[in-house]
């Protein structure tokens, strides 16, 4: 028997980056979790169905976080005076090593999953650690919470501390075993191949992971061109490759299956060509890019090449879980890029940033992040009454104030 859900309220979503659709006191109808109608009145076929009326509240799509490190949740706000590589060595690697203990993992991951719920993040793409058992704990907790995610067991077999490094062969064996075990979580929580970044993965490991991604038909996530020191390091490790991006491409870790790369701040035009060719998604992480002095990603330039873009909190390089705050930070950084760097690339608009935080990132999951017909229904109910305002506002203005 089909399950029908009808929501009533002030509806807002972005079917395209340039456009808000706003429907005052409108209706969303979903059958078996998929939107079949969104409009001003109830079609006759559904006239007898129960309606959940949210009054004057706003109804928006759930947020999508395309890049976060779940094990770093307790490190938020630490090391903001350091750049990427010293920050990893001082704070990140010691914390991630603790996840060899599954009980510690359950404690931290439980708090992280609760934070996703509290901030309206209904879909996420997450890094775990190198520990397969702890990564399965994260997947279990997400499934029990009813949150959809791609979760990665991290791979690292070089240039890593002794307490957080794998042997190449064992890393691939563990990854295969983890992929097999991940099938228990069904369609809601899925695995994603996760080489940490090129400096921490040998060519043998990267090639093996590329083969596993194709064998199991699972997507790939990693980091790309976040920091100048990192880029120089990659060049010294792989002098045979023309650029950082092509190291991934040559190891079949870009474009053979759906791929998302975090940061992408310092890409050359040739690398942007490769991103466009492979339709690799960029996870733009504005808070992290500022906190670790990495730079400001050329988002408008990437948009002009029709490269898919989502937003990432990048916990804990980023210190805030809320994607509402991440999207407003993305707008602010785009203004600085425009004023200080290149007047040819206009700042992001609210609709563009909101799109990235919903449908833009949601594309990695399929038809997600919008209330268009055929989309999976992820919805947030927003009560903005505490934001005192005696003036009449449009729905877009109310949303902007709440964000």
Residue positions per predicted region:
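Metal-coordinating catalytic core of metallo-dependent amide/deamination hydrolases
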Residues: 133-265
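His/Asp/Glu-enriched, well-ordered alpha-helical/loop segment
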Residues: 250-256, 300-386
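Alpha-helical scaffold segments that flank or form the walls of functional sites
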Residues: 76-147, 171-185
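Active-site gating loops and adjacent loop-to-helix segments of metal-dependent hydrolytic enzymes
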Residues: 74-105, 153, 158-168, 227-256, ...
């Amino acid at each position: 028997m089909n399950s029908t859900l009808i929501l009533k309220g002030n509806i807002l979503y972005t079917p395209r980056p340039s456009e808000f659709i706003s429907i005052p006191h409108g209706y969303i109808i979903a059958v078996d979790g998929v939107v079949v109608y969104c409009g001003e009145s109830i079609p006759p076929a559904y006239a007898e169905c129960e309606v959940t009326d949210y009054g004057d509240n706003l109804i928006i799509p759930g947020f999508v976080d395309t890049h976060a490190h779940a094990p770093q949740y307790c490190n938020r706000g630490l090391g903001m005076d350091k750049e990427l590589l010293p920050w990893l060595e001082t704070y990140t690697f010691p914390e991630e090593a603790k996840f060899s203990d599954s009980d510690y993992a359950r404690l931290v991951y439980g708090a992280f999953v609760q934070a996703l719920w509290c901030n309206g993040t209904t879909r996420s793409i997450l890094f775990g650690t190198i520990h397969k058992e702890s990564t399965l704990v994260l997947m279990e907790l997400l499934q029990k919470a009813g949150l959809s995610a791609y979760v990665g067991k991290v791979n690292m077999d070089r240039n890593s501390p002794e307490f957080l490094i794998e042997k190449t062969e064992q890393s691939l064996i563990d990854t295969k075993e983890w992929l097999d075990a991940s099938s228990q979580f069904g369609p809601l929580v899925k695995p994603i191949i996760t080489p940490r970044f090129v400096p921490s993965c040998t060519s043998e490991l990267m090639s093996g992971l590329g083969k596993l991604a194709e064998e199991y038909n699972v997507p790939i996530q990693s980091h790309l061109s976040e920091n100048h020191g990192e880029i120089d390091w990659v060049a010294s490790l792989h002098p045979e490759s023309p650029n950082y991006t092509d190291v991934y491409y040559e190891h079949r870790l870009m474009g053979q299956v759906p791929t998302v790369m975090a940061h992408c701040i310092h890409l050359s035009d040739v690398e942007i060509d490769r991103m466009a060719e492979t339709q690799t998604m960029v996870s733009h992480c504005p808070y992290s890019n500022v906190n670790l002095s990495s730079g400001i990603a050329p988002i408008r330039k990437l948009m002009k090449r029709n490269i898919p873009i989502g937003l990432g909190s990048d916990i804990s390089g980023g210190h805030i879980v809320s994607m509402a705050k991440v999207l407003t930070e993305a707008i602010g950084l785009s203004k600085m890029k425009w004023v200080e760097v290149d007047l040819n690339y206009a700042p992001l608009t609210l609709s563009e940033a909101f799109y990235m935080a919903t449908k833009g990132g949601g594309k990695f999951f399929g038809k997600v992040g919008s209330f268009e017909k055929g989309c999976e229904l992820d919805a947030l109910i927003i009560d903005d009454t505490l934001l005192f305002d005696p003036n009449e506002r449009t729905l877009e203005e109310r949303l902007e104030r709440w964000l």
